[in-house]
Amino acid sequence: MAALGRPFSGLPLSGSADFLQSPPAFAGRAFPPGAAGHDLAPRPGVRGPPSSPDGRTARGRVSIHCRKKHKRLAEDDECPVRKKRLTEAELGAVADEWVLGTHQGIEGHGVNTCPGGLSVPSILDAVCEEMDQTTGEPQCEVARRRLQEIEDRIIDEDEEVESDRNVSHLPSLVLSDTMKTGLKREFDEVFTKKMIESMSRPSMELVLWKPLPELLSEKPKPSSNPKNYMGESQTKHTATGTAFPQRTEVLLEPQCTDTPLYHSLETAASTEEEMEL
């Protein structure tokens, strides 16, 4: 308590300002409380100047890289050995197949190896164009083959349907015995066979019918007495002549009865006119 307010006897007054400043090796960084001497010692590593920002960025990059490396090592340690071997073998096989396929494709299509004068993009473009041409032709052939297969299948199905059809399913015409005998009498035998064959086809439907002689006579029956026929016609004419004048008389009678009514109306109208005068 007595030392407050007066300088300490063990230290010179001239070095008080230097004593309060931090050492140059740890400038810009405060020491945490309770730090020991071995913690305060400088660590080996890439460091910039004490006051430059490049040194801080370098330290940050190194720390991030170390963290990522430790994380990868931890993940690899956690993965089982058998799984590691399987994945490595699969990746190696895929890479080998890809390399072999590219070499075989280049040799098969006749593309020369990369000379010194040509660039890699030009060779890749040429290989892609040749692959497009070779893949386009088989696609057309495959499409034509498929169309031909479909057409053949349709034709085969139609033939199978026609072969499966039975004659019993088709419409047929059954001729009676009387019709057959009538056709044989009037027509030739060959013609009747052709007609029957044509009628048995499904595209034609024809029915032939001939009436029997009892139903329809070939000649009209003559009248028994022509004189009676003339007399009957004359009586019909006279009957119509007598009926016609009777009708005319009936039509004229109402006209005769209507005339006195008109006369009476005319006389009544004349008397009214005289009275008005």
Curated annotation (Swiss-Prot):
Matching InterPro entries = CCDC117 (IPR031630)
Question: Region (Disordered) spans which residues?
Answer: 22-69, 216-242, 255-277
Bias (Polar residues) ranges: 225-242
Q: Where is the composition biased (Low complexity)?
A: 23-55
| Subcellular location, record wording | Cytoplasm, Cytoskeleton, Spindle; Nucleus
> Does the keyword Mitochondrion belong to this entry?
no
Give the UniProt entry's GO cellular component terms. cytoplasm; mitotic spindle; nucleus
**Keyword Coiled coil listed:** yes
Task: List the GO biological process terms.
Answer: positive regulation of cell population proliferation; positive regulation of DNA repair
Residue ranges annotated as compositionally biased, kind Basic residues, are 58-69
Coiled-coil intervals: 139-166
| One Pfam family from the record | CCDC117
Which parts of the sequence carry Omega-N-methylarginine? R47
Residues the record lists as Phosphoserine modifications: S52
Going by the UniProt record, its keywords in alphabetical order are:
Coiled coil, Cytoplasm, Cytoskeleton, Methylation, Nucleus, Phosphoprotein
Relate the protein's function as given in its record: Facilitates DNA repair, cell cycle progression, and cell proliferation through its interaction with CIAO2B.
State whether it acts alone or in a complex, and with which partners, per the record. Interacts with CIAO2B; the interaction is direct. Interacts with MMS19; the interaction is indirect.
This protein is called: Coiled-coil domain-containing protein 117
